[in-house]
Regions:
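Divalent metal-coordination and catalytic microenvironments
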Residues: 16, 38, 49, 70, ...
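Histidine/acidic residue-rich metal-binding segments in metalloenzymes
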Residues: 122-137, 141-298, 314
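Histidine-rich, glycine-flanked metal-binding segment
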Residues: 1-43
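C-terminal cap of metal-dependent C-N hydrolases
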Residues: 315, 370-435
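His/Asp/Glu-enriched, well-ordered alpha-helical/loop segment
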Residues: 194-223, 270, 291, 296-298, ...
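Active-site mouth loops of central-metabolism enzymes
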Residues: 48-61, 84, 89, 108-120, ...
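Alpha-helix-loop-beta-strand connector modules within alpha/beta enzyme cores
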Residues: 42, 92-108, 155-171, 328, ...
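Metal-associated gating/positioning segment near the N- to mid-region
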Residues: 36-105
Length: 438
C-alpha cells in the first residue's frame, strides 16, 4: 500500500525506518527477506482512542494485554486515553505513573493524551512539556469520578492555554442539557432495554455539542477533534464549519459502521457504548460522511471492563458503556467497506494516515514511504474468520463481535522493523513510549 495506491513492490528496511521502496522484482541478495505473497503490506494502523486503564484498573485492561491485541490486529501505535486509569492523566505526576506502568510491557508503540477537567487548566502547559500529544475532555459525565465533565466556563479557562500550546482538544461531544432532558423524561421503573437507553442519548445532543464547541472556537481558535461520532445529524454542521476553514476533525468507530440499533439483541449489554449505536439510516449516513471526507478517521474507542460490569441482567443503564475491539478494527471496517466498494487505500487513509496526522506523527507514521518508520501490517484482504473470544488478546473476551464472520486477516506486524507478531505468535515487547518531536 503505497501513497499512490496498491502496487507490487519491495519495501527495504534499514534499522527502524523504510530506506527504499522499489519494483517487486528488485530483491537484494544477502539480506533477510520476508515474502508477503499476495497479501497487502500496509502502514500499521494508528489508533488514537484506546483506554488501557493501567495503573489503578489493570484488572480491566493493561499495557501488555492491550498492546498484544493491537499487534494482532495490525495496530502499530496506540494512544492511551487519560481516563479509566487511576490516577487519571490530568497532571504530570499521573503521566509519570502511566509511563512507569507501561515501561517494558508494550508490544506496539504507545503515546499518551492528557485530560482537561474542572480546575486543571494550570496543569496543561506542564503536561504538554512532559509529552502528551493532545488533550481530552467530556461535556457529560465520563462514568468515572476522577474524570469529571467540564462546563462552558471550564472550556473558557482551558481554551487560551490550548491555543498557546497548539495541541488538539479531543471532546466527548454530547450536550449535557439534552442528555438531562432525555433522562428526566425516562420512566423510573424502566427495565433498561436498548430502546430506552438509545432514547436517553438523543442524536440531537451530539449536534448541539458540536455547535457549542464551534461557538467556543469562535472566541478562541484551537484545533478541536470530535471523538466517536455516532450521530449523522452533526454532519451538516461539520461540513459548513469545514467550508469556512474551521480547524475541526472527526472520528467514528467500527461499531457505529457495523451495526444499527435493530441489530442489538435485547439485554445484550456488550453492545453498550456512549454515544449509542443508532438506526440503519444513520449508519449509512456515517459511511457517506467517511466517503466524502467529512469524517476523517476510524479508531476503536477500545473501552473494556470487568465482565461483571456488563453482566447486569440486561440493563443498559447500569452496564458499563464501552466496546472491546482493538484487535478487530481493521477486519470489521474492511468487512463493511468492501460492501460499499471501498478499497484498502480508503482503509489506510481512515485508519493509518488521518490518525497519524491528528497527533502530529504524519511525517513518520501512516505511510509506506522512504524515511517513515517501518511500522508495518501485513494482511490478507480475502481471508475470512469467525471471531472466537478465546483468541482475543485483550484482558477480557467480552465483545459484541463474538461469533461474527469478518473478512481481512492480519498475519504479520512489524514495529520499527522488528517482527512483533506473526500468525498468533508474539516476539518480546518492542514498542516505544512516544514523545512529541520538538
Amino acid at each position: 500500500m503505497l501513497p499512490t495506491g496498491v502496487a507490487p513492490a519491495v519495501v527495504h528496511v534499514f534499522g527502524a525506518s523504510i530506506a527504499h521502496v522499489s519494483a517487486w522484482n528488485d530483491v537484494p541478495s544477502g539480506v533477510p527477506v520476508y515474502d508477503a505473497g499476495d497479501r497487502i503490506v500496509m502502514a500499521g494502523l494508528v489508533d488514537t482512542h484506546v483506554h488501557i486503564n493501567e495503573p489503578g484498573r489493570s484488572d480491566w485492561e493493561g499495557f501488555a494485554t492491550a498492546t498484544r491485541a493491537a499487534a494482532a490486529g495490525g495496530v502499530t501505535t496506540v494512544f492511551d486515553m487519560p481516563l479509566n486509569a487511576i490516577p487519571a492523566t490530568t497532571s504530570v505526576a499521573a503521566l509519570d505513573a502511566k509511563r512507569a506502568a507501561a515501561t517494558g510491557q508494550c508490544y506496539v508503540n504507545v503515546g499518551f493524551l492528557g485530560g482537561v477537567i474542572p480546575g486543571n487548566a494550570h496543569e496543561l502547559r506542564a503536561l504538554a512539556r512532559a509529552g502528551v500529544f493532545a488533550f481530552k475532555a467530556f461535556l457529560v459525565p465520563s462514568g468515572v469520578d476522577e474524570f469529571p465533565a467540564v462546563s462552558e466556563a471550564d472550556l473558557r479557562s482551558a481554551f487560551p492555554v490550548l491555543a498557546e500550546l497548539g495541541l488538539p482538544l479531543m471532546v466527548h461531544a454530547e450536550h449535557p442539557a439534552f442528555i438531562r432532558e432525555a433522562n428526566t423524561a425516562r420512566d423510573d421503573g424502566s427495565r433498561g432495554g436498548y430502546a430506552e437507553y438509545l432514547a436517553s442519548r438523543p442524536a440531537i445532543a451530539e449536534q448541539a455539542a458540536i455547535e457549542l464547541l464551534l461557538r467556543r472556537q469562535d472566541e478562541c481558535p484551537i484545533p478541536i477533534h470530535i471523538v466517536h461520532l455516532s450521530s449523522a445529524l452533526g454532519l451538516s454542521v461539520l461540513r459548513a464549519a469545514r467550508a469556512k476553514g474551521r480547524r475541526i476533525t472527526v472520528e467514528t468507530c467500527p461499531h457505529y459502521l457495523t451495526w444499527c440499533a435493530h441489530d442489538v439483541p435485547e439485554g445484550a449489554t456488550e453492545y453498550k457504548c456512549a454515544p449509542p449505536i443508532r438506526d440503519a439510516g444513520n449508519r449509512d449516513a456515517l459511511w457517506s460522511g467517511l466517503i466524502d471526507g467529512t469524517i476523517d478517521m476510524i479508531v476503536s474507542d477500545h473501552s473494556p471492563c470487568l465482565p461483571a460490569m456488563k453482566d447486569t441482567d440486561g440493563n443498559f443503564f447500569t452496564a458499563w458503556g464501552g466496546i472491546a475491539s482493538l484487535q478487530l478494527g481493521l477486519s470489521a471496517v474492511w468487512t463493511e467497506a468492501r460492501k460499499r466498494d471501498r478499497s484498502p487505500a480508503d482503509v489506510a487513509r481512515w485508519m493509518c494516515e488521518a490518525p497519524a496526522r491528528l497527533v502530529g506523527l504524519d511525517r513518520c507514521k501512516g505511510h509506506i514511504a522512504v524515511g517513515y518508520d517501518a511500522d508495518i501490517a501485513i494482511w490478507d484482504a480475502d481471508a475470512e474468520f469467525v471471531v472466537n473470544p478465546a483468541r482475543l488478546e485483550h484482558r477480557h473476551p467480552v465483545t459484541p463481535y463474538a461469533g461474527r464472520r469478518l473478512r481481512g486477516v492480519v498475519n504479520t506486524t512489524f514495529i520499527g522493523g522488528r517482527l512483533a507478531y506473526h500468525d498468533g505468535a508474539f516476539s518480546d515487547p518492542c514498542g516505544t513510549l512516544l514523545v512529541p518531536s520538538l
